[in-house]
């Protein structure tokens, strides 16, 4: 008899060994799991179906964004910001360009400030539409995703019309924005699905300017939000999956540095747009929705209410922009490129253009921290300059990183199925978490 067979028989005949049972087991949740929202990897220690401990692993989407920004001139790193939270692109840009403007002591024209405010809120609605659709899909409500993407597609067209890109816009610039709002919206082309009267009906709202299109959007959007709420807010299954699940107390939210809907869902009224106004948020009227219980359901209600408030802000910005034409970029050619027409007639303008896009501009030595109220929370940019044309240090404060850090403290004691609901309400995007 072989030694292996002897050892096997001895193990099988041992009465003590045969009675041993595994109480807790470890399970990998993600990064391939459909509810992982990107590349989330959670190591869950389970006691049956109950979560005993959660260990989030990060870094699978790390691209060294901060170091990349430190190797480029200041004005060439704006596109990197779009690729952090790639659902809330322009809000990321806003924090970065505000930091540069703070160090240089420049201020964007008033019209550019209103445009930034308007597009920050367009971005917020886009983010929350993606969130409500994907979170509902995670919990089994498939129809909401189709409804939400109907409106999100219209806002993607607005992005494309103003910047040429549906996602990575690179529209904000130090000193203003890339260009003024276009006079017309993209039109649907004839296809085998859309032709004749149907095509004309789809293009009916796109005959005017972008501001006309957005004005019509703000008039119809509240009724669309009502449709989402009809599907979810009083839905018995939705409430069973979210009410009293993932409760985050105000003290816990503060201790983990939570911001945005995660913090306001726990009843803390903190919003940088009100507490530390930037752009033109001090000139528009809106309210800050807050929750009471701090559970997944409250965080859902806060985000739905935020979409309504963002719609109010966009409507006010559209009204002001229609009545007040003006420049959207500073006229300092050391910071802003000259017009193409000017470069054809003026050699000095051509030199400015060449210098600006070859070596950029030198930012005075100093350091600053600039933060914006992004859809997921406080997105901040700490920028340090040594007087050169490249940043000495760039540090990005991503709200999702702080929120993910609290995962272990929040999920303990809940069932595995509840973890999916909690991850959904965290609204994680790993471009910003891993950076």
From Swiss-Prot:
Coiled-coil residues are none
> What InterPro entries does the record tag this protein with?
NADH_Q_OxRdtase_suD, NADH_UbQ_OxRdtase_49kDa_CS, NDH1_su_D/H, NiFe-Hase_large
Where is the protein localized? Cell inner membrane
GO CC annotation, single: plasma membrane
A Pfam family matched in the record:
Complex1_49kDa
Please describe what this protein does.
NDH-1 shuttles electrons from NADH, via FMN and iron-sulfur (Fe-S) centers, to quinones in the respiratory chain. The immediate electron acceptor for the enzyme in this species is believed to be ubiquinone. Couples the redox reaction to proton translocation (for every two electrons transferred, four hydrogen ions are translocated across the cytoplasmic membrane), and thus conserves the redox energy in a proton gradient.
- Full protein name: NADH-quinone oxidoreductase subunit D
**Mind giving the lineage of the organism this protein is from?**
Bacteria, Pseudomonadati, Pseudomonadota, Gammaproteobacteria, Lysobacterales
